[in-house]
């Protein structure tokens, strides 16, 4: 193995572990899989193909979400009502994840990147409003008889996004659980982790049956996933005592960079 090859391997390991640790801490704090945060590292720092990014992100999200949910459940950050809503969401999410996985490989790379940019823009807008403070959203409570059907339908929508883009979907699911179903932010994060697990598995299984699980994607998943799991443990441990505001600001800047980069690529086409 030549010197240049060893340098490339060292760079790959450092970027993968470092970015995985950073995104894992954020995921542990907020209750996410961390997929959106990993997109710029995988696409631009590691220069991975889009399909490898999607598959690697799904695998890492599953490992991170599994650790997050286990630690949060042990800390008592879950309720019976939340589990009931989560179960209904899972039903819809499984169907959505399958459909989204199929759609992702029928779209051109340009359209898929445009979809990612749009999704990240929505996440950034919500995050900026949170950081500004004093901005609150309330859509009222859902009649109890409609809770489960609504949860299943919204799970379907988030599942489509998860399967198509390779994300766990917590950024979209948590606001729904808080604003529509009235769950506390910490319980909502735990519930979202639970829904993420089977959703990710379905999406990953479908990508595999279509032949899009490659050695490159698995290599990224192992290296970055190791850092993400360690970060998730750290983030979950400090969840109670930290507001995560500084991390949110860094996250917002990272999302902005990704959106600008994707937009410039699309404009050059």
Language model: regions and residue ranges:
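Juxtamembrane transmembrane-helix boundary motif
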Residues: 1-24, 44-45, 50-52, 70-164, ...
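Transmembrane helix-bundle signature of multi-pass membrane transporters/permeases
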Residues: 54-65, 189-200, 229
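Transmembrane helix boundary and interhelical junction motifs in multipass membrane proteins
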Residues: 31-39, 164-176
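Aromatic-anchored, glycine/proline-accented short structural segments
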Residues: 173-190, 194
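Alpha-helical transmembrane segments of polytopic integral membrane proteins
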Residues: 39, 63-66, 100, 121, ...
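Residue-level recognition of oxygen-bearing side chains
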Residues: 37, 58, 172, 193, ...
